[in-house]
């Protein structure tokens, strides 16, 4: 059985793991955080139809219920190298090594640093937050400004 390592347990990584496991591959899914779908799980609702993020996370977790999938959470892959025998060597931040016939990198995205757009006031004015920060506040019902107070007014800029 061919082995494949997938780096990243977000939507793309999980979908790939599910499809490849059903095709008979031995899949190892690496995720640097302590849970899969972390970026999605921190949101309340998803665009464009406002589906609850928790529902999507639950559905994606079901796709991992396959004996051909091994999850390695809290495992930050920091190096990837091709060995002489055409096997891939993956090394994590703790120095542990893993070997695989194939590798798929599905590491997701990095949110835009709003500090780079000074004209929006992020980091300058206490009440300015990004849409991702607002999503997280809504998700965990902790809508507060930088002083820890619940805002009296909210405005959205696009």
Segments predicted by a language model, with ranges:
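Short loop/edge segments at beta-strand edges and connector loops
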Residues: 73-75, 92, 130
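A conserved beta-strand/loop element that lines the FAD pocket in flavoprotein oxidoreductases
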Residues: 64-78
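General small-molecule cofactor/ligand-binding pocket signal
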Residues: 28, 70-72, 129
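Glycine-/small-residue-rich beta->alpha transition segments that form the dinucleotide
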Residues: 100-113
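Conserved beta-strand-loop-beta-strand element in the redox core of flavoprotein oxidoreductases
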Residues: 81-97
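Short, well-ordered alpha-helix to beta-strand connector turns
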Residues: 24, 68, 100-101, 125, ...
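FAD-site-proximal beta/loop scaffold in flavoenzymes
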Residues: 112-151, 156
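Beta1-alpha1 glycine-rich phosphate/pyrophosphate-binding loop at the start
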Residues: 2-67, 155-158
């Amino acid at each position: 059985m061919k082995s494949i390592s997938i780096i990243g347990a977000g939507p793309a990584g999980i979908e790939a793991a599910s499809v490849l496991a059903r095709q008979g591959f031995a899949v190892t899914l690496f995720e640097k955080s302590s849970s899969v779908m972390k970026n999605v799980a921190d949101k309340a609702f998803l665009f464009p139809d406002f589906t609850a993020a928790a529902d999507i996370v639950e559905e994606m977790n079901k796709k991992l219920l396959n004996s051909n999938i091994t999850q390695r959470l809290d495992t930050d892959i920091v190096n990837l190298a091709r060995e002489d025998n055409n096997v891939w060597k993956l090394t994590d931040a703790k120095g542990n090594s893993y070997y695989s016939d194939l590798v798929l990198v599905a590491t997701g995205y990095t949110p835009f640093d709003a500090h780079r757009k000074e004209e929006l006031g992020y980091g300058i004015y206490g009440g300015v937050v990004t849409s991702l920060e607002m999503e997280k506040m809504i998700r965990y019902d902790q809508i507060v400004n930088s002083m820890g107070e619940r805002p009296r007014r909210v405005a959205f800029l696009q």
